Amino acid sequence: MKHITDLYESVNSTMSNKSDCPPVVLPEEVFFTISVIGVLENLIVLLAVIKNKNLQSPMYFFICSLAISDMLGSLYKILENILIIFRNMGYLEPRGGFESTADDVVDSLFILSLLGSICSLSAIAADRYITIFHALQYQRLVTPRRAAVVLLIIWACCIGSGITIVTFSHHVPAVIAFTALFPLMLVFILCLYGHMFLLARSHARRVSTLPRANMKGAITLTVLLGVFIFCWAPFVLHILLMTFCPADPYCACYLALFQVNAVLIMCNAIIDPFIYAFRSPELRDAFKKMIICKRYP
């Protein structure tokens, strides 16, 4: 919260001095409501996979990882609002030691949300690539145990990177490293897509004989990736502009949309579960069983 709040205060200062564009301010109730819905939706996804043995496969493990990332992004805003309420009620000393520590923890959740989403989408992309072009070896190459190990490595790296970024968040190299992860992830996934496209053209007949579920999973990834880019790209651009051209009047007008960009990030956590449910009959069935309290096989 400290780093994001400082950023927002700096934006407001820039608006008043360098631009005719007033900052767009949204009610805190909007943030809180979206965050609570995001946590509940992704918690349902996790419970559905945990309770349904038919969903306990590497693909759904990676989806659960993405759901956890979305939950962290929603929890970030909920905890931030709680801290603000406590501070306004006088229970926290402004800029005090406890608040500073709590701010770092909350900011770490935000960083973890982005890093976890990037890595989870990359893992899903790699999984779909293997599913389509190494279908016969898939069961041998991608086992639940190997998927679990990959996820442990991913989250260990995310936690380490998140702590480092929060610790050095006021240094330009740290900001560049943080924002660079976004395009690097896109390049990695687009390279996989490009390779898949070239192989699909040269092996059109073999690809057409693949199980429909394999191709459907690739389409699901495409939708998830598109939503992720739409929701996160404006904020990443915001960070870059705030770092390199905060005084420019054109940049300042874009920076006025800080809270709008923040809402887009939280909407990502709400949209993803609907994509899972819409694209996966197995998950839809699991959700229905959870709603009517029917036992799983």
UniProtKB/Swiss-Prot annotation:
<dbReference type="InterPro" id="IPR001671">
    <property type="entry name" value="Melcrt_ACTH_rcpt"/>
</dbReference>
<keyword id="KW-0325">Glycoprotein</keyword>
<keyword id="KW-0832">Ubl conjugation</keyword>
<dbReference type="GO" id="GO:0007189">
    <property type="term" value="P:adenylate cyclase-activating G protein-coupled receptor signaling pathway"/>
</dbReference>
<dbReference type="GO" id="GO:0005737">
    <property type="term" value="C:cytoplasm"/>
</dbReference>
<feature type="topological domain" description="Extracellular">
    <location>
        <begin position="169"/>
        <end position="180"/>
    </location>
</feature>
<keyword id="KW-0472">Membrane</keyword>
<feature type="transmembrane region" description="Helical; Name=6">
    <location>
        <begin position="218"/>
        <end position="244"/>
    </location>
</feature>
<dbReference type="Pfam" id="PF00001">
    <property type="entry name" value="7tm_1"/>
</dbReference>
<keyword id="KW-0812">Transmembrane</keyword>
<keyword id="KW-1015">Disulfide bond</keyword>
<feature type="topological domain" description="Extracellular">
    <location>
        <begin position="80"/>
        <end position="104"/>
    </location>
</feature>
<keyword id="KW-1133">Transmembrane helix</keyword>
<keyword id="KW-1003">Cell membrane</keyword>
<feature type="glycosylation site" description="N-linked (GlcNAc...) asparagine">
    <location>
        <position position="17"/>
    </location>
</feature>
<keyword id="KW-0297">G-protein coupled receptor</keyword>
<protein>
    <recommendedName>
        <fullName>Adrenocorticotropic hormone receptor</fullName>
    </recommendedName>
</protein>
<feature type="topological domain" description="Cytoplasmic">
    <location>
        <begin position="50"/>
        <end position="58"/>
    </location>
</feature>
<feature type="transmembrane region" description="Helical; Name=3">
    <location>
        <begin position="105"/>
        <end position="126"/>
    </location>
</feature>
<dbReference type="GO" id="GO:0004978">
    <property type="term" value="F:corticotropin receptor activity"/>
</dbReference>
<dbReference type="GO" id="GO:0019222">
    <property type="term" value="P:regulation of metabolic process"/>
</dbReference>
<keyword id="KW-0807">Transducer</keyword>
<feature type="topological domain" description="Extracellular">
    <location>
        <begin position="1"/>
        <end position="23"/>
    </location>
</feature>
<keyword id="KW-0675">Receptor</keyword>
<feature type="topological domain" description="Cytoplasmic">
    <location>
        <begin position="127"/>
        <end position="147"/>
    </location>
</feature>
<dbReference type="InterPro" id="IPR001168">
    <property type="entry name" value="ACTH_rcpt"/>
</dbReference>
<feature type="topological domain" description="Cytoplasmic">
    <location>
        <begin position="200"/>
        <end position="217"/>
    </location>
</feature>
<keyword id="KW-0564">Palmitate</keyword>
<dbReference type="GO" id="GO:0004930">
    <property type="term" value="F:G protein-coupled receptor activity"/>
</dbReference>
<comment type="similarity">
    <text>Belongs to the G-protein coupled receptor 1 family.</text>
</comment>
<keyword id="KW-0449">Lipoprotein</keyword>
<feature type="disulfide bond">
    <location>
        <begin position="245"/>
        <end position="251"/>
    </location>
</feature>
<dbReference type="GO" id="GO:0005886">
    <property type="term" value="C:plasma membrane"/>
</dbReference>
<feature type="transmembrane region" description="Helical; Name=4">
    <location>
        <begin position="148"/>
        <end position="168"/>
    </location>
</feature>
<dbReference type="InterPro" id="IPR017452">
    <property type="entry name" value="GPCR_Rhodpsn_7TM"/>
</dbReference>
<feature type="lipid moiety-binding region" description="S-palmitoyl cysteine">
    <location>
        <position position="293"/>
    </location>
</feature>
<feature type="transmembrane region" description="Helical; Name=7">
    <location>
        <begin position="257"/>
        <end position="278"/>
    </location>
</feature>
<feature type="transmembrane region" description="Helical; Name=1">
    <location>
        <begin position="24"/>
        <end position="49"/>
    </location>
</feature>
<feature type="topological domain" description="Cytoplasmic">
    <location>
        <begin position="279"/>
        <end position="297"/>
    </location>
</feature>
<feature type="transmembrane region" description="Helical; Name=5">
    <location>
        <begin position="181"/>
        <end position="199"/>
    </location>
</feature>
<comment type="subunit">
    <text>Homodimer. Interacts with corticotropin (ACTH). Interacts with MRAP; this interaction targets MC2R to the plasma membrane. Interacts with MRAP2; competing with MRAP for binding to MC2R and impairing the binding of corticotropin (ACTH).</text>
</comment>
<feature type="glycosylation site" description="N-linked (GlcNAc...) asparagine">
    <location>
        <position position="12"/>
    </location>
</feature>
